[in-house]
Amino acid sequence: EIVIIAIPTKAVADLPRALFVSVPSSVVVIDIGNYHPELRDGRIDAIDRGMLDSQWVAQQIGRPVIKAFNNIFAKSLLEKGVSRGTKGRIALSVAGDSSDAKAAVLGLVDDLGFDPVDGGDLDNSWRQQPGTPAYCRDLEAAPLRRALAEADRSRIAEYRAEREAQIRRDIASRHDESDKR
């Protein structure tokens, strides 16, 4: 069994503290969220001081999480899954500390039509966060592994700020296009 947390990061703190108390430890929890302090979430001090967003989520819910599906656009997830072995198959990275839980999520990624890539432990989940070379680029497995390796941890805040600026530009562009209609 798998539970997916798919809410804004700021809302995780508002979940009932006992939400997962009666959920068996064998149930895998996937965090698919991304922290956007300027666009949506406001500032979360622990994350701004260096805690990774998925580590913060795990702390808030009192349960380990696997980071996955945060580095693909919904449209790609919906439309671009293909059979194993298909040339050009998009890869998705999965990061987490439990090898069993991670294996379950890697299998889910494959079942959904994407090449699963082990992104390391949760401490390495920053490599697939907004703005990094691996974020939302619809890469195949080998290029995704290279992109994960190329990420520079000292640039996390810069990566995030660049991505948020791009989102703002995209929103403004869509707004301008709708005004022309």
Segments predicted by a language model, with ranges:
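Short beta->alpha connector loops
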Residues: P8-A11, I72, S98-S99
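Conserved residues at beta->alpha junctions
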Residues: A6-I7, D48, G96
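Short amphipathic alpha-helical segments
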Residues: L15-L19, D41-G42, E79-K80, L106-G107
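Rossmann-like NAD(P)-binding element
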Residues: E1-I30, N34-R40
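Residue-level detector of anion-binding/catalytic polar loops
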Residues: I2, P64, D115
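Solvent-exposed polar/charged
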Residues: V21, Q59, G107-D110
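Rossmann-fold NAD(P)-binding glycine/threonine-rich loop
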Residues: S25-V28, I32-S83, A101
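Active-site-lining helix/loop region of Rossmann-like oxidoreductase modules
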Residues: K87-R181
